[in-house]
């Protein structure tokens, strides 16, 4: 039920945020609540920026404070702020594990990490925000490899694995090949990083 409550974000934002078949938005594409079936209101410019910010926040399952910190790091780095922002988010350990398709959701990725079921280059890491470096190998511990959720996720192949990850489904491991640009990330929904930059630049 906890995951179902998290999926309410899709209905609030008007998109199937994670692109999953069980997403309630697929059958009830209107906002949650008593008057939800009245549809979505046309948002203001700020409303669009705020919604874009919310999409990223929910998609990566991070707090507003964490999002702002990621933006500040991206802004200070050389290069395109949008690419830097997305690159930092995609480099998080929870994102790498989720995008590998070895787990069904970003929430299950965070749970496995916090329960110390995940190795980075052979060492246990239990921090979801840990930044994985190019060339690093993320592996599930032996006990986690046979979890029903892991086996089901691999068999379903519901999540498209991006080409900047190299996944070994036998070993239950994933190698980070390169930091992606915004345009390379196969988001299931439209993610407008330019509006997020505008939101934080107000």
Curated annotation (Swiss-Prot):
Cleavable signal peptide: none
Domain spans labelled S4 RNA-binding: 91-168
GO terms, molecular function: rRNA binding; structural constituent of ribosome
SUPFAM superfamilies for the chain: Alpha-L RNA-binding motif
GO CC aspect terms: small ribosomal subunit
Protein name per Swiss-Prot or TrEMBL: Small ribosomal subunit protein uS4
Pfam families recorded: Ribosomal_S4 (PF00163), S4 (PF01479)
Native source species: Ehrlichia canis (strain Jake)
Quaternary structure (record): Part of the 30S ribosomal subunit. Contacts protein S5. The interaction surface between S4 and S5 is involved in control of translational fidelity.
